[in-house]
Structures are given as C-alpha cells and as structure tokens.
Curated annotation (Swiss-Prot):
GO MF annotation terms: hydroquinone:oxygen oxidoreductase activity
Coiled coil: none
Additional observations: Inhibits cell proliferation of HepG2 hepatoma cell line with an IC(50) of 2.6 uM and L1210 mouse leukemia cell line with an IC(50)=3.2 uM respectively.
The protein's name: Laccase
Co-factor binding details: Binds 4 Cu cations per monomer.
Protein function: Lignin degradation and detoxification of lignin-derived products. Exhibits broad substrate specificity against a range of aromatic compounds with highest activity against guaiacol. Shows lower activity against 4-methylcatechol, 4-hydroxyindole, catechol, hydroquinone and 2,6-dimethoxy-phenol.
Length: 8
C-alpha cells in the first residue's frame, strides 16, 4: 500500500 493507511 501507499500512504498512512494499508489495505488488508
């Protein structure tokens, strides 16, 4: 992922 959030 990219940025402060991550996809599970």
């Amino acid at each position: 992922a990219i940025g402060p959030v991550d996809e599970v």
